[in-house]
UniProtKB/Swiss-Prot annotation:
It is an enzyme of class 2 (transferase). It catalyses: L-lysyl-[histone] + S-adenosyl-L-methionine = N(6)-methyl-L-lysyl-[histone] + S-adenosyl-L-homocysteine + H(+). This is Histone-lysine N-methyltransferase SET5. The gene is SET5. It comes from Scheffersomyces stipitis (strain ATCC 58785 / CBS 6054 / NBRC 10063 / NRRL Y-11545). SMART domains: SET (SM00317). The lineage of its organism: Eukaryota, Fungi, Dikarya, Ascomycota, Saccharomycotina. Keywords: Chromosome, Cytoplasm, Methyltransferase, Nucleus, S-adenosyl-L-methionine, Transferase. GO terms for molecular function: histone H4K20 methyltransferase activity.
Amino acid sequence: MTAEGLEKKIEVISINDSVPQETGPVVPHERQVVDAIIAIWKEDPTTESLGIPKLHAIVKNKYPNWSVSEKRVKTLLKKFGLTPNTNTEQFTYASDITSEDTPHIQLPAKIQIVMTSKRGKGLYAKHKIAKGELIWEETPLFFIPPLANINLVKTGKACSHCGKLLQTTTGSSMLKGLDCNVCPEVWCSQQCKKLDSAIHGLLKHNVYNPNKRLTSSKIIDSESFLELQEYCLKESWNALYAIALIYANILLDKTGVKEKQFRAMARVSQDIRYKALNSSAGAFDTLSGGALFVQEQQETLWREGFEKFIRVFPTSTSKLTYKEFLFMMGTYNINNLDSCIFLTQSHLNHNCDPNTNVDTSPVRTEGLKVYAARDIRAGEELTTTYVNPAHTVQQRQRELRVNWGFICGCQKCKEDVKIQHRRKSSTVPAASKSEIRDMLKAAENHVGEEGIELTPPEVSGERRKSVRFDEKVIAVQE
């Protein structure tokens, strides 16, 4: 490559912190304050036990131009139920989640689906399962490629189906028959090309034949899909992108089974989920389209996304109501794993100390494998973890309540709370000045004015090892 060609490929951009930031005082929104504190807790879990003054000092140090008082920090944490022993009732939506019997599901030999009043629909062991045993493996019911790679896909630099970055040249792809003969997109393998063959043309090719846009029986408007795809990329809205692909696959399934299976999953409206966000000021994953705005702005975003969504499916406008759109988005958000939807895996309920390990393949189209993390008894429920078990119990509870609508009461959560209480109770409170004076006076009365003379140790020449105190030590100087 010549120097001139290289120069054309290089773009000089300005880094955010190279531009001087505003130094004037800024009054942050209450959600900004609470989200900042939650971020501090995530970065350093030990800060969760700090008092309000120290926590306020960290916030001020991190955001020096914020005009936020210690009193306001305390008020906001109390308002959103983020202070210890708070009496504030926190919003949950587990009771709003519904599910139905899953039709046409082929389960592994050792497990069965059981519906209970407390846990809802779950997977239970029919027979004893040994630790380390492969219980089942499955490929996605709905595969969702990475939204972030869309521009690379459009230029043939990533696989049109799985989104995998391509190292081969376009020429070699053409020789292998992996290039599309209509658009610039290519596939990484014959397998991906085969999996993508039915839907690729419907989503992306009609735009190249304007006459087809006049066909009344067309179930997918590719031009509208490409517009929606760009919109999702701009807004970082993975859930909207995902449900568009899911509904396209549902329309292509002439048996109607995929639609029934998706509707049978744990189902909740996205606007209900958003209430949990507002009640805690904690953030959803930004890709889910749920954490960027206050309620009024969020409603506007949903409406705009809905209008773009229904334009993609011109023959389904009577069926696709705004209410159903929100249900589809909420259902996707609480059931997806690594952005994809798995039929059997979606039945696994949560436990912070799960008895299964779910291993997703680095090759995303290959799906996942579920192993027994320990011996599982016959009749025992199979569980997975929705959050990182290594996080503090408070952080796990926040994430579970906002993203899945419930407050976990598993044994690990109970034990973690007990451990925290024991640690707090074992800490000796700092002595007050009056207590120190009383201690000194009592010591003087006991030993007299001359004090105690300490003789040097008989063995010298070796430095004593330092003593590490686990309790607080009071040093007194005259």
